[in-house]
């Protein structure tokens, strides 16, 4: 596996990998890799001739009081995991490489980026859209793979790709991969490392409460009362606050006030200990 830090070197390496019409699948990450990331890598390998991964902790998607400095960084360990999975190339740019002096461009995707995490973390998805667009332009992949755990991020990236007429990758080749969970139901996340043993045990209550809410909504219960009960259950499990618990259209992320059978997603963000955990699950046919 090649590990590359300079854009000129990346372009040459990508050209070499694409030689002879070979295809590339891209898995962008912020490092602190876990089984969820490796699942993306394996799906990428199934879809293309070569897999390219990136590790870049993007400062533009962190707010002023968020965990940029504390976010786990373990490049050597992560690189070894990617190499063991057969990744051909690791793109690991510096902040100065991605945002040199004088950098002045920002991508903002209205609508889908303004609710849920977008409302709780202003500017977050501008940072996500900007860095992902840059990474797409740098790597020029045929496919890009993202975890469905951050459903809103996936929706923002697809909207951006569609609106900007991106072809590498085309929006239809931006692939969402189902959330990987522990046996307890807790969604895998790099931020789970912040949890103590007690907090991790309490955090399992999130997915259980979400499943109960989904069963109620699909069974005909009122959406508003089901979400209110979900919030109460999350707090009772040991979470200190709930940023949001929303039912939204799976494609547009518009609020669903009355569930009528169209594909929807239950999206939740809640805080426990020093961690802000997000999760989502499908409601109705997917």
From Swiss-Prot:
Respond yes or no to whether keyword Cytoplasm is given for this record: yes
Q: Report residues binding ATP.
A: 30-37, 147-150, 180, 188-191
Q: Which domain of life is it from?
A: Bacteria
Q: Name one GO molecular function term.
A: ATP binding
Q: Name one GO cellular component term.
A: cytosol
The record, for Pfam families, names: Pantoate_ligase
Q: Which GO terms describe its biological process?
A: pantothenate biosynthetic process
Q: Does the keyword Protease apply?
A: no
Active site as annotated? 37
Quaternary context = Homodimer.
Q: What is this protein called?
A: Pantothenate synthetase
What is the protein's species of origin? Answer: Novosphingobium aromaticivorans (strain ATCC 700278 / DSM 12444 / CCUG 56034 / CIP 105152 / NBRC 16084 / F199)
Underlying gene: panC
């Amino acid at each position: 596996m090649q590990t590359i830090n300079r854009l000129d070197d990346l372009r040459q390496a990508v050209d070499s990998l694409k030689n002879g019409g070979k295809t590339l699948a891209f898995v962008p990450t912020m490092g602190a890799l876990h089984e969820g990331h490796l699942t993306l890598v394996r799906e990428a390998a199934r879809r293309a001739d070569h897999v390219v991964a990136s590790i870049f902790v993007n400062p533009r998607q962190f707010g002023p009081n968020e965990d940029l400095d504390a976010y786990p960084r373990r490049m050597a360990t992560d690189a070894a995991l990617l190499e063991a999975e057969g990744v051909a190339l690791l793109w690991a740019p510096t902040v100065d490489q991605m945002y040199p002096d004088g950098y002045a461009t920002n991508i903002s995707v209205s609508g889908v980026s303004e609710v849920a995490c977008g409302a709780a973390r202003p500017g977050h998805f501008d940072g996500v859209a900007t860095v992902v667009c840059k990474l797409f332009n740098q790597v020029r992949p045929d496919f890009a793979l993202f975890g469905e755990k951050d459903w809103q991020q996936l929706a923002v990236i697809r909207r951006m790709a569609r609106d900007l007429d991106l072809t590498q990758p085309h929006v239809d080749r931006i692939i969402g991969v189902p959330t990987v969970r522990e046996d307890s139901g807790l969604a895998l996340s790099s931020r789970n490392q912040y949890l103590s043993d007690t907090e991790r045990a309490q955090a399992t209550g999130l997915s259980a409460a979400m499943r109960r809410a989904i069963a109620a909504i699909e069974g005909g219960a009122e959406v508003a009362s089901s979400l209110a009960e979900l919030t109460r259950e999350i707090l009772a499990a040991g979470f200190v606050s709930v940023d949001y618990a929303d039912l939204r259209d799976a494609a547009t992320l518009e609020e669903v006030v009355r569930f009528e059978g169209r594909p929807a997603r239950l999206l939740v963000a809640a805080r426990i200990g020093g961690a802000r955990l997000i999760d989502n699950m499908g409601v109705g046919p997917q």
